[in-house]
Amino acid sequence: MRQAGLVIVVLEGFHAVKHALRFAPALVRRITVASVSSALALCDALAPDVRELLLALAVEGPVKHPTGVQGEADRPLEDRSVLRQRSAPLVLLDDPRHPGNAGAAIRVAAAAGASGGALLGTLDPWHPAVLRGAAGLHFALPVLSCSLMEVAGPVFALDADGEPFPSLPDDAVLVVGSERAGLSVDTLARADRVVALPMRAGVSSLNLATAVSAALYAWRLAGLRTPGADAGTARPG
């Protein structure tokens, strides 16, 4: 396990700061705001639950982000146990190439109640562009790099040539390839089942985050798991 505090990450924008305060407030080191009153107005409109936390840490200063809010936080302790045992699907991205798409997939995983988000390949899951794409929701679930050999549980690999998409078991590993390269040969060989999302004839692929979203919400809507402490319905942003 990595020690928190060895790596500091930048929280770009109000939503990233909001999610860090909501899910890991003890890790937030600093919040810089262009205007305290404007930042509090954002809290009142979008996240009243973090208002007092933001007020306690906010210091006025220059901010480049258009929301007028940015911050710094310690990277959380790395929880690798989710690779071996889980009560909700683990999203495993097979060598993603686009940091923003990987971040968007992590954002969906957090929203849908996945147990974690893991990346195969060379992309750092905590790269600033990945964190930006996830709107700071790295603090809501374990996010890490791993190898195929570390992963246990039934592996469901999404591929256009797979069998019709089934209901995912709660301990599933949902593997999604990159838009350009798809799934690697090693991943396909490791998969217990290769499955496909139903799509209109002539449509061959989906955006990475869209595919993750469709699969995870099919799992949720199937009633296989009753999520605890849901925050409610989605709000844009």
List PLM regions with ranges:
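RNA substrate-binding interface of SAM-dependent RNA methyltransferases
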Residues: D49, R75-G162, L221, G232-A234
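Amphipathic alpha-helical repeat scaffolds
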Residues: G13, R97-A105, S204-A211
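Active-site/ligand-binding-proximal alpha/beta "capping" segment
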Residues: A157-N207
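N-terminal positively charged helical leader segments and presequences
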Residues: M1-V69, P227-G237
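Structured adenosyl-cofactor binding patch, chiefly the S-adenosyl-L-methionine
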Residues: G71, V108-A112, T122-P125, A129-H138, ...
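Short, hydrophobic beta-strand segments that form beta-sheet elements in well-ordered domains
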Residues: V10-L11, R29-A34, V143-S145, P154-A160, ...
